[in-house]
């Protein structure tokens, strides 16, 4: 069941940014690591790897930038996540 929070609600009606590195995690490419699934920051379009990936670049991006929300960019998935409130939307 999808939930919401103020962060997810703030991005709900805004156009999504274009993915900066479609189809790949820039951090993994730079560091020579591999990703499991990809996520995209809804604030800036940074594409990063998920928490199941060794490097967890999406979470790292949140910690470094404070950008609170991301979405899955996996085919057939449209869910969003808020790192601040730990809510799936």
Predicted regions mapped to residue ranges:
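Short cysteine-rich clusters marking metal-coordination/redox-active sites
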Residues: 25-28, 41
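Cys/His-rich, Zn2+-coordinating zinc-finger modules
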Residues: 3-14, 19-21, 31, 47-89
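Canonical RING-type zinc finger of E3 ubiquitin-protein ligases
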Residues: 33-42
């Amino acid at each position: 069941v999808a939930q919401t929070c103020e962060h997810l609600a703030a991005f709900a009606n805004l156009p999504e940014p274009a993915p900066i590195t479609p189809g790949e995690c820039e951090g993994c490419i730079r560091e020579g690591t591999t990703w499991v699934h990809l996520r995209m920051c809804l604030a800036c379009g940074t594409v990063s790897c998920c928490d199941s990936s060794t490097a967890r670049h999406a979470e790292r991006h949140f910690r470094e930038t404070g950008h609170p929300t991301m979405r899955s960019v996996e085919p057939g998935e449209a869910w969003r996540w808020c790192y601040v409130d730990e809510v799936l939307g």
